[in-house]
Amino acid sequence: MDVDVIGIGAGSPSHISLEAIGALADVDVVFALDKGDAKADLLAARQAIVDKHAPHVELVAVPDPPRDRTPDNYGAVVRDWHQRRAELLADAFVAHLGREGKRRGAFLVWGDPSLYDSTLRILQRVRDLGVDVRSRVIPSVTAISALTAAHGECLNQIGKPVLITTGRRLGERTPGTDAVVMLDGGAAWLEHADPEEEILWGAFLGTELETLRRGRVGDVGEEIAELKKELRAEHGWIMDIYLLRSGA
């Protein structure tokens, strides 16, 4: 059976590419992991894309199994979570696509499928369960490019590397290394960034809720941390990303 992985950009409906629209037109069923009422906006955004570009497509929501968000053994917990997701999705594929492969499925992935997204790994786990899944992968606008564009800045400084990491791993960064930080459930910059570093922060990029802040960590770090708490409390969820960089 065929299950495509289609990048839909960082949040704006305009981020979806002509290639992605063409791929979506070939699809019969879009699968989505349903994260509950707190993140219903994410499911609604996918439904809006389907309604606009491929109204013939059925959206199937598969309940996302819960997991511990602050585990002692992060890797083992996430691998177990991915396995449980794969088992649920394997059943959904068979139920809605059929083993004979006459229907085509897809996932609509925020940002680009290659960057801090688990869909491709989970599909491999589905294959390991004995379900023959073939996938096209359609790239798209990343949260990184949406962040730098929103701030009107280049990602890298001349002759300097950029680390892409998570909030959980920010403390392992070599001092002075510029870094893009994703999947920060808290405010790791308060503990692991130099007060003299500049932070370029954005939340809900590309949406009507887009919120941007920038400045020295020592000047705006606490403000951004409080703002992030307020936005999460107001909307029930938040997607944010930031760039930390030292002086040129």
Regions of interest found by a model, annotated:
Residues 11-13, 168-169, 184-187:
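Short beta->alpha connector loops
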Residues 32, 60-63, 137, 157, ...:
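Structural signal for conserved beta-strand scaffold positions within catalytic alpha/beta enzyme cores
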Residues 37-40, 141-145, 188, 207-209:
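Short gly/pro/ser/thr-enriched loop/turn and capping motifs at secondary-structure boundaries
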Residues 25, 51, 127, 149, ...:
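Alpha-helix boundary recognition
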Residues 3, 173-248:
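A contiguous loop/helix-start segment that scaffolds small-molecule binding in enzyme catalytic cores
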Residues 65-71, 144, 170-172, 206-209:
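A short acidic, often aromatic-flanked loop/helix-cap motif at beta-alpha or helix-coil junctions
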